C-alpha cells in the first residue's frame, strides 16, 4: 500500500534539516572562524582532521547504540536534535567563552556527534518505514532526497541572503536552523518506532572483522575524502584566486 504524501513529508523536512547542518561544518565554519577570530588555516585543518578521525571511531559505536537502544529512539533523537541545534548556535551565534580554537573544536564535536547519530537513526527508521508498504523504498527515497537537495541548497546561499537583513548573518542562520530542528522533530513525531525490528545486536568490532565490510569502508573513505577537502577549501579558493 503506497504511503500518503503527508506521512512522507516529515522525512523530507528531517532530511532537509540534516543536509543544512552538514554544509556549514565544512564550508562556512572554517571561513567564519578565520575571518572573525583570525584562526590560521593550519590550526583549523588540524582540528577538522582530528575530529574526522574521532568521527571514524565513534560512528560504529553510535550505530551500535542506535540498535541496542532502539526502544528509546524517540527521546534519543530528541536529545540529539537539541545538541545539534545548541552546537550550531554555539558555533556561529555565541562569542567563544574560551580560546576560539577550543570553542571551534568543542562545538564541532557536538555537531559531528549529533549529526552522525541522527543520520543513523533517520536512515534506520526509513528502512523500517519502507518495508511497511509496497514500493515504499522508492517513494520514501524520493521524498528524502528531495528534502536533502533543498536543505543543502538553502544552507549554501542562506548566509549571503541573510547578510541583507543583518550584520550577523551566521548568527541568524544558526537561530533559524534551531527553529528548523524543532519543525523537523514535530514533522517526524509519530515515526520513531524503533522497537519494531527484532534483530540481534552486533558489536562494532565484530562488524569490522568482516573483510568485505572493511573493503567497503575503505571505498567509502576514498569516495568521501575528496568531497570533504574540496568543500572546506572552496571558499578560500574563490576568495584568493577568483
Language-model regions, residue ranges each:
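Membrane-embedded alpha-helical bundles of multi-pass transporters/translocases
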Residues: 1-242
Amino acid at each position: 500500500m503506497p504511503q500518503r504524501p503527508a506521512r512522507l513529508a516529515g522525512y523530507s523536512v528531517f532530511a532537509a534539516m540534516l543536509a543544512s547542518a552538514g554544509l556549514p561544518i565544512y564550508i562556512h565554519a572554517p571561513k567564519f572562524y578565520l575571518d572573525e577570530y583570525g584562526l590560521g588555516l593550519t590550526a583549523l585543518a588540524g582540528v577538522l582532521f582530528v575530529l574526522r578521525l574521532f568521527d571514524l571511531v565513534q560512528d560504529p559505536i553510535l550505530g551500535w547504540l542506535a540498535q541496542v537502544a532502539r526502544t528509546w529512539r524517540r527521546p534519543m533523537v530528541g536529545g540529539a536534535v537539541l545538541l545539534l541545534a545548541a552546537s550550531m548556535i554555539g558555533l556561529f551565534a555565541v562569542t567563544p567563552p574560551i580560546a576560539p580554537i577550543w570553542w571551534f573544536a568543542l562545538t564541532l564535536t557536538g555537531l559531528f556527534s549529533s549529526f552522525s547519530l541522527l543520520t543513523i537513526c533517520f536512515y534506520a527508521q526509513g528502512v523500517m518505514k519502507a518495508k511497511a508498504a509496497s514500493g515504499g523504498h522508492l517513494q520514501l527515497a524520493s521524498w528524502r532526497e528531495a528534502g536533502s537537495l533543498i536543505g543543502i541548497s538553502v544552507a549554501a546561499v542562506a548566509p549571503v541572503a541573510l547578510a541583507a537583513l543583518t550584520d550577523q548573518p551566521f548568527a541568524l542562520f544558526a537561530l533559524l536552523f534551531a527553529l528548523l530542528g524543532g519543525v523537523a522533530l514535530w514533522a517526524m513525531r509519530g515515526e520513531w518506532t524503533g522497537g519494531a525490528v527484532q534483530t540481534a545486536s552486533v558489536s562494532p568490532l565484530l562488524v569490522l572483522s568482516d573483510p568485505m565490510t572493511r573493503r567497503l569502508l575503505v571505498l567509502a573513505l576514498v569516495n568521501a575524502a575528496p568531497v570533504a577537502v574540496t568543500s572546506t577549501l572552496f571558499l578560500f579558493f574563490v576568495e584568493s584566486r577568483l
